[in-house]
Amino acid sequence: MVDFSSASSCFDIENLSLAYDDKPALSDLTLKVPRHRVTAFIGPSGCGKSTLLRALNRLHDLNDQVTRTGRIRLEGQDIHAREVDVAELRRRVGMVFQAPNPFPMSIYENVAYGLRLQGIRRKRELDEIIEWALLSAALWDEVKTNLHASAWTLSGGQQQRLVIARTLAVRPDVLLLDEPASALDPISTLKIEELIRGLKSQLTLVLVTHNMQQAARVSDYTAFLHGGELVEYAPTDTLFTNPRLRRTEDYITGRVG
C-alpha cells in the first residue's frame, strides 16, 4: 500500500479490468493516484500502461469493442456515472500524446481553440490566457514575437510544448502524458522533463514512459505493470532502489524486458 503522506488522492481506481474484443488488457487493478504529484506508469510494450492512462479520461468510449469492469473515481466522483459530462471530464483530464499534434493554424489559434469552444471571445481575455498557458509550457519567450506564424514552423519539441500549452489553457485538473518525449531529441526531452516537474504545483500529472531513467528523474510515484497486472506501486525512489518484488527488480535492471 502506498502512503501518500501529505498528498491526497486525485484518482481512486478500484478493481479495474478492461478487454479489447474479449482479449484482456487490464486485470483487476486497484491503485490511487495522488494529487499534485507526478505518477509514472512503466512496463514492457503491451503491458497495459497506455490502456490504463486512456481509461482515466474515458478515451476507450470511442471503441465499442472495449469492455470494462471496476470503478475509477476522480476527486470522489465515478467518472462513468450517468450524470458525468464526458466533454467536461476531458477538459478536466487533458491528454498529450506521443507525437506532437498541433492544429493546422497559427500558434495563437492553437492555444485559443479550446478557449473559443468554451465561449471565450474577448481578445484581451484570450491574450491573457494564451500568454499564461505559453509561459506555463515554457514556450512564451520562444514564440511571443511570432504568435501568428503557423504552428508547423516550430520544432518537434516546441510543437509538443505548444500542445501542452493548448491543453493547459482550458485549466485542467490533470494532465495525462503518453510517452511525450519519445520522439524528441535529448535537449527537447530535457525541456519537457523540466516542464513536467514544474507543473505539479498546478495540477496532477500521470506519465507513461518506456524510459525508466526518465521515470526516475521526473516522477514521485511509479507503478510497474506487466501482462495487464499491477505488479508493484511505490514512491519512485523506493521502487528503483529497493523494489519489494523480484519481478520488479528484474525489469528495472534489464534482466527481463
UniProtKB/Swiss-Prot annotation:
Name of one Pfam family that matches: ABC_tran
The UniProt entry, under InterPro entries, shows: AAA+_ATPase (IPR003593), ABC_transporter-like_ATP-bd (IPR003439), ABC_transporter-like_CS (IPR017871), P-loop_NTPase (IPR027417), PstB-like (IPR005670)
Which molecular function terms from Gene Ontology are attached? ATP binding; ATP hydrolysis activity; ATPase-coupled phosphate ion transmembrane transporter activity
Residue intervals of the ABC transporter domain: 11-252
- Where, in this chain's numbering, is ATP bound? G43, P44, S45, G46, C47, G48, K49, S50
**What broad class of enzyme is this?**
translocase
- Membrane topology summary: Peripheral membrane protein
Gene Ontology annotations for the cellular component aspect, listed alphabetically = plasma membrane
Q: What's the catalysed reaction?
A: phosphate(out) + ATP + H2O = ADP + 2 phosphate(in) + H(+)
**Places the protein is found:** Cell inner membrane
Give the E.C. number(s).
7.3.2.1
Keyword annotations for this protein, in alphabetical order, are: ATP-binding, Cell inner membrane, Cell membrane, Membrane, Nucleotide-binding, Phosphate transport, Translocase, Transport
Q: Provide the primary localization.
A: membrane
Q: Coiled-coil stretches, from where to where?
A: none
The GO annotation for biological process reads:
phosphate ion transmembrane transport
Looking up NCBIfam families in the UniProt record yields: 3a0107s01c2 (TIGR00972)
Q: How does it assemble?
A: The complex is composed of two ATP-binding proteins (PstB), two transmembrane proteins (PstC and PstA) and a solute-binding protein (PstS).
Q: What does this protein do?
A: Part of the ABC transporter complex PstSACB involved in phosphate import. Responsible for energy coupling to the transport system.
**Family per similarity comment:** Belongs to the ABC transporter superfamily. Phosphate importer (TC 3.A.1.7) family.
The protein depicted here goes by the name: Phosphate import ATP-binding protein PstB 2
Source organism: Chromohalobacter salexigens (strain ATCC BAA-138 / DSM 3043 / CIP 106854 / NCIMB 13768 / 1H11)
